[in-house]
Amino acid sequence: MPPKTEIVRVTPANAAVLDLVAEDVFDRPIDPDLLAAYLAEPGHLMIVAVSQGVVIGQARGMVHRQPDEPTHLYVDNLGVTPSRQREGVALRMMQALFAWARECGCAAYWVATETDNGPARGLYTSLGGDVEAMVFYEGDL
């Protein structure tokens, strides 16, 4: 049985929880200034999964308001250290993001993932979301 895992909403007051992070939870090392700006931003939330004092997973979401659509949760990023995948950690973090989104008045959510990311696609399918094809563009500003 895996060690106990706690799901935590990260705030400026408890951001030190990010001092110990397992491998591959984030894409890059955390920059303290960027973290402070993120946590200060209204409508943004980072959820982490903590086991034995180490962050083993993270999920980030943003409230996306539009003038012509209901308010949505945009799930920006989700990661779980490889050694703790397939234990339901990602599902628990998504459920915590959904609870927060409902508190913020969100009516729905959206998330994107790579077409070849089978585990992520399985998770998002299990949450009842509809698959929609899209094209993604990215560029420097």
Language-model features, listed with the residues they occupy:
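A short beta-loop-alpha structural element at the N-terminal edge
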Residues: P2-L18
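Active-site rim helix/loop that mediates acceptor-substrate recognition in acyltransferases
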Residues: D27-M46
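Conserved GNAT acetyl-CoA-binding A-motif
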Residues: A101-A112
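Conserved beta-strand in the GNAT
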Residues: V48, V54-V63, G79
